[in-house]
């Protein structure tokens, strides 16, 4: 198990990573997400031993690295996969994967598993971006690392290839049976691939939980907004035992709620675009469409309620409503929504 305790990294007088704590089980995949400059890559560099830590410790198996006792990268048995592939251009696929490898049977295993058997003699220049990343992954796993760090491995690939390759990488990591930390800026990638997701903000891990919990029960408004389109709807919530169903009341309907941070009384309800319906054909109206964004399979609308709250609603692409149209919006979800204390 990879264990990280109160890990902090300073660059001069600036703290870049602040008191990071996490444990990663065997074959578990942790996705790290956050805005640019939040400390994601710094964490990977610290875990790999490429930079020293300022406070705390990390350990795996028979080694422990601290601020006073630094364990170098070669003593950690860590595998790294980079966004730019980091392949040797003058070597073939086979030679890249076998580089400094004693047991070539492991190279054969991963070349076959990752669909590279017919490209053994090819140089990287002849490969597509997806094939290059498969070679990089095969090279990493063939060395039987104790844990794997992936730094935005799909960021240089097109959207269609990303969607398929993310599952190939996940499947390979699971078959290798090693813990992995995967840095990404893509929230959808994080939610779909990770066993758990960690959301970083200014060097602080704001939430570490299952993908479902990070999306539906975010620990903060920052997490709520970062993990997807988020609107906050004025509501009231009775936090006493008398409210058995944990019902939250709003101007556009009642829904079950999950109170966070001691929310009670006047509250803000976290609403995702798919929690709502929008109809411009009814005689009753309660909002005005401000703008619409076509997304292919759907359309995203921003609507202003008569009460003053702005919401975002996602509906079928076939349902086209023009801006400035009067419409009727209502809550349609049946699952509990996150409830935050009212923001003054």
Q: Model-found features: residue ranges?
A:
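ABC ATPase nucleotide-binding domains
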Residues: 77-79, 92-222
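ABC ATPase NBD Q-loop/coupling interface
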Residues: 57-76
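Helix-to-loop junction immediately C-terminal to a conserved catalytic motif
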Residues: 48
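Non-catalytic connector elements of ABC transporters
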Residues: 12, 41, 230, 240-344
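ABC nucleotide-binding domain signature
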Residues: 31, 70-72, 76-86, 181
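The feature captures the beta-strand-to-loop junction immediately N-terminal to the Walker
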Residues: 33-35
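Conserved coupling/switch loops of ABC nucleotide-binding domains, chiefly the family-specific signature
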Residues: 54-57, 202
